[in-house]
């Protein structure tokens, strides 16, 4: 990040926190989201962590959620994907999964939150089946939320099972106007339950891009 900032002439801000990019989501309008792991990694109380992050990141509200699994990577991008200021895709697992209760509590929390525009979030659920993974993963499931949005395309990791197509359909419904592409891993390292497409990529935003914001059109309004 320092080399990149130097290359394009940006100022460098030294954030006094351990900051894992895969465990932070923002709506772009002052609202942030992470799991409790973000606080734990910094060995701070939640209030201390929130004070620092809000001072440096200009956040109005920072929501901290329970870790989905004590033995997992615990990053929020393996649990959910904000695909717009008012739309989120949240994973769904089988009832016998150790993550089930936490994931459902997470989804219920979003049902109680309002967006930047003062309306409920539009929530889409995406079923993530169990997968065969590496020895280091506990109860792994397909990480369909660990996707990459790149300009007008959405790349969704594929696992070669019957639920791959359903995952693409969820994204198409949640993100009309985007080209949704199933992305098969063609390297020697397969997609894991906690290490997939979003974990292995880094987006670079265009500071000259025009930004237009408006309320999404909802039929019930």
What are these regions (language model features)?
Residues 1-218:
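The feature marks the mature, well-folded catalytic cores of soluble enzymes
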């Amino acid at each position: 990040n320092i080399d990149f900032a130097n290359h394009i002439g940006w100022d460098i801000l030294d954030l006094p926190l351990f900051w894992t990019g895969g465990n932070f989501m923002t709506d772009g309008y002052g609202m942030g989201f992470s799991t409790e792991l973000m606080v734990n990694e910094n060995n701070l109380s939640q209030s201390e962590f929130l004070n620092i992050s809000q001072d440096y990141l200009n956040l109005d509200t920072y929501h901290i959620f329970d870790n989905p699994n004590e033995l997992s990577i615990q990053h929020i991008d393996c649990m959910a994907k904000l695909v717009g200021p008012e739309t989120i895709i949240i994973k769904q697992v089988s009832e016998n999964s150790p993550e089930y209760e936490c994931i459902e509590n997470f989804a219920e929390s979003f049902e109680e939150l309002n967006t930047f525009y003062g309306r409920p979030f539009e929530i889409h659920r995406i079923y993530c089946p169990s997968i065969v993974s590496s020895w280091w993963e506990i109860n792994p499931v397909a990480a369909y939320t660990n996707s990459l949005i790149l300009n007008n395309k959405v790349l969704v990791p594929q696992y070669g099972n019957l639920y791959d197509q359903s995952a693409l359909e969820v994204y198409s419904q949640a993100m009309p106007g985007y080209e949704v592409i199933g992305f098969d891993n063609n390297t020697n390292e397969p997609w894991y339950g906690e290490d997939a497409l979003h974990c292995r990529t880094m987006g670079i935003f265009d500071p000259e891009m025009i930004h237009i914001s408006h309320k999404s059109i909802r039929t019930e309004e």
